[in-house]
């Protein structure tokens, strides 16, 4: 089978990479949005909060138990930067159907679980749980601060911040600490709803299942995905190189031991 890609819902694209040589199959669901300073931290925080539980599995213990029933299926969060785009969502992996002891079909429940985590997260009073948001905020801020503690990562980030100061590419995939610290469960929920309704969703499957079956599984799993006015991603910008190079020197204490 050849690679398959098409728009299966408004602003939702499915790519299937047929592969029968692996013992596992994977399904990723990632929203692709513009990388900018105001939204980067919100986007980075969102999948971490969504991974804490759903209305049916309201905590990580219940969610983990549900994955265990699917031969130890794993669902991990992903936050990455691709050029001037930020991609956030989940990547799920499970054993391929061919290796299920009882001949179970695992693609459908795996897709359903990913869809449930994105579309039916645990809420209270119409918003994400405050304790989950605050907990994941601490983790996000710790991750942002950790970059400074790794001198190589910090040097690379500072290079991009200075070299691409006027460009989206200069924004960290995790956003900045100041913005992250101001996020609340109310503002994050509103941001999440906007992303669900207008963001471009990229679904990628790699495994041995037939294309028609994969398409049917994800259409069912994401049938409740709200689709409003699509966010039109701006074209990649090209900036002319400056006529003269800039030299910037920063000093930092380094301890060895």
Regions found by a protein language model. Give the residues of each.
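Short, polar/flexible loop-turn hinges at active-site or ligand-entry regions and domain interfaces
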Residues: 53-56, 98-101, 120-129
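Compact, aliphatic and Gly/Pro-tolerant "microcore" segments centered on a short helix or tight beta-hairpin
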Residues: 126-194
């Amino acid at each position: 089978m050849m690679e398959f890609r098409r728009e299966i819902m408004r602003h939702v694209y499915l790519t299937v990479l047929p592969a029968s040589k692996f013992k596992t199959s994977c399904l990723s669901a990632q929203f692709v949005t513009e990388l900018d300073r105001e939204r980067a931290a919100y986007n980075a925080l969102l999948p971490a909060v969504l991974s804490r539980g759903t209305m049916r599995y309201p905590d990580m213990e219940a969610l983990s138990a549900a994955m265990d029933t699917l031969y130890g299926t794993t669902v991990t969060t992903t936050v990455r930067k691709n050029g001037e785009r930020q991609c956030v969502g989940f990547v799920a992996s499970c054993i391929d159907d061919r290796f299920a002891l009882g001949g179970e079909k695992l693609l459908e429940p795996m897709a359903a679980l990913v869809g449930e985590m994105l579309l039916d997260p645990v809420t209270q009073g119409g918003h994400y749980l405050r304790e989950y948001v605050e907990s994941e905020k601490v983790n996000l801020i710790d991750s942002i601060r950790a970059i400074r503690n790794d001198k190589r990562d910090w040097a690379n980030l500072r290079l991009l911040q200075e070299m691409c100061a006027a460009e989206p590419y200069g924004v960290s995939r995790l956003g900045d600490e100041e913005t992250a610290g101001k996020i609340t469960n109310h503002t994050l929920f509103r941001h999440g709803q906007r992303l669900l309704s207008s963001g471009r969703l990229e679904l990628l499957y790699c495994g041995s299942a037939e294309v028609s079956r994969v398409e049917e599984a994800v259409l069912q799993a994401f049938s409740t995905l709200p689709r409003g006015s699509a966010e039109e991603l701006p074209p990649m910008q090209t900036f002319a190189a400056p006529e003269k190079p800039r030299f910037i020197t920063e000093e930092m204490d380094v301890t060895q031991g």
